């Protein structure tokens, strides 16, 4: 049985349990900005690096490569306002890594408004299915945008795919229309929460139940799987801390009876 565990205590945690065993864990951080779409201002262009440094309202300017495949965008000038997306968050002395190749994530697809390429997830391996999804993507996009079909698209009805593409495209249109009058720098689109990202990734794979200590999660996850709200310490009930500690040990025991030794 696959259980999605959502703990909203002092240190939030989202876990995927397979038959009670912790298989994957996420630690949501307040202020996560990866995937956010921003309006920034070009502060400096470095021709030798074919890159620009962009003020996005953070402590450090973001780093923006200026030559990106399939976008067809020209070089900006110092002082220009540019729509960018955070690909990697700022870390240490480095500012955020930015892109102008915006991608908007849905359950079944990624929409790329700066590209016209139609792609399919590498996890879908059957040639016939890949070809059919590409044809469906082209019919939906009509050269207006690019699409990357996710694994959840494999068995989705065409009308549902078309509806999600239209929703994502309208989201992009809202961003594009807001940019000319927005303050620089500013946020044009907030990133998905960690919970939203996990739900998007695991919904097509199947979730048997959701267990949480936060009633608000039950509302967000309604219709995905049966939800159980337990107002007690889920980390204790499901022995999460001991499982995390065990997973970090040098010697890990495998279900087959063997051991895996991990040395740094």
Can you name each region flagged by the protein language model?
Residues 1-264:
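DE-rich acidic low-complexity regions and acidic surface loops
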